A protein has these predicted regions:
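Nucleic-acid endonuclease domains
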Residues: 1-32, 39-109
C-alpha cells in the first residue's frame, strides 16, 4: 500500500484505501487511459513480480520501500513484461518477474 500511496501522490491520483476482499483485480490506477499496477518490494535486490494469471494491467510499476521511504525503480508495458519475463523457480505459483534493469525510468511514464 505504501508504494500505491506514493504513486498516487506523485501523479495526483486518488488512492483507494478500502481493502477489497477480492483484491483490486490487478489494477491500482488509471493514468491517461492506461491501467497501472504498482508492485512494491522491500527486498534488497527488488524485482517486479506477478503471477501469470494476475497480469492484466497495461503498465506495471516497481516501487522499493526502505525505512518508510519509497523509490520508484521504473515501469514496463504489459507486453514487454510478458516477452521479457523469467520464472521464479521453487516458488508457489511459479510467478513471473523482470529485474529493474529492464524497466523504463519513472520520469518517462
Amino acid at each position: 500500500a505504501l508504494g500505491e500511496i506514493a504513486f498516487g501522490r506523485l501523479f495526483g491520483l486518488e488512492v483507494e484505501m478500502i481493502q477489497k476482499p477480492d483484491g483490486d483485480d490487478g489494477v491500482d490506477f488509471i493514468l491517461d487511459g492506461r491501467s497501472i499496477d504498482v508492485k512494491t518490494s522491500e527486498a534488497p535486490f527488488p524485482k517486479l513480480i506477478s503471477l501469470k494469471s494476475k497480469i492484466k494491467a497495461d503498465i506495471y510499476v516497481l516501487a522499493h520501500t526502505k525505512n518508510n521511504k519509497v523509490a520508484f525503480l521504473g515501469w514496463i508495458r504489459k507486453q514487454n513484461f510478458i516477452d521479457k519475463h523469467q520464472t521464479l523457480i521453487g516458488v508457489e505459483g511459479s510467478p513471473w518477474y523482470v529485474t529493474n534493469e529492464m524497466l523504463n525510468p519513472i520520469t518517462t511514464l
